[in-house]
Amino acid sequence: MVRGVANFVIVLVALAFGGGRAIDADEIEVVVSIKPVHSLVAGVMEGVGRPALLVTGTGSEHSYSLRPSQARLLDEADVVFWVGETMETFLIKSLQALASDAEVVELWKVPGLTLLATREGGMWEAHEHGDGLADAAHGEGEHVEEHEEEHAEEHEGEHAEEHEGEGEHADADHEAAEDHAHGETDMHVWLDPTNAKVLVEAIVSVVGNADPQNASTYQANAARLQEQLAELDRSMEDRLATVSDRPYVVFHDAYQYFEHRYGVNAVGAITINPTVRPSAQRLREIHERLEHLDAACVFAEPQFEPALVDTLIEGTSANKGVLDPLGADLDAGPDQYFRLMSNLAEALADCLGGAKSG
């Protein structure tokens, strides 16, 4: 019965993305937007080929600039995986201009994902709750929704313009970044290992259809990944159990799926748009609220001005930590996703369980 359900899901994924197309070349050319997704794709393709990664180093998925060599990768791609247009905002026009012949898979639309609604304005911005921000932080469970077919049609036909100059790219990226902050669905879907398992099913279906001669290898790799993801989920649940009630604040509201899965107590975010630096007035307001909420930790991100956190925690009892939803400092490859998620759990457990340093 379980095998039958799994096969049915694979068929649904294949139908959702047009059934794929078989590639004649010995090795398919697969391009992936960000490291966590690249890691899952690399795990499925291990022993057959190596997918190319676009956002490297500590680059932001919201404002990354493609190099000419990466533009060529898109032009030559058979398959492109990305999360979606309100996440990798830099890719919107490039995919239309350069990857029109590729099978482009927008992963947030994969059937079977648990999706969470974006928390409007971020927890700190919920003025209607006054100082009851901790209550706002625990409302995310109300927004769980199963993915349905209408999501696959929400963004069709919105971007018909051709690839043009850098100025127009900047405007498009800025507008899409605003959409990221205010869109209906939180796009950080990979930060729940149960969603990662669904993504693996989609990935193996797509690459198997594109490269049927290696489909059995992809399936074997995917089965191994599913076991590893289940073990990762269990170990993270155990690691976080003793600190799940301690309040903390993050740099931007990227971790809702992680919070929902493991029941940890995030009570605020410094910003809803990580590309825009908070004003001095806002930083003062947040500093006051940190004291009011008695937050145990404030977490920076390596991509976005970690020094801000030093300013915010000065004179409070909060510890400083670093969380990275992309694993930007980790080497790309099949192990990256597992190290990313383990690092998130370790960083939370260490900071929330520690005493004030300095």
Task: State where each predicted segment sits.
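Bacterial N-terminal signal peptides
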Residues: 3, 7-18
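Extracytoplasmic metal-acquisition and chelation regions
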Residues: 17-358
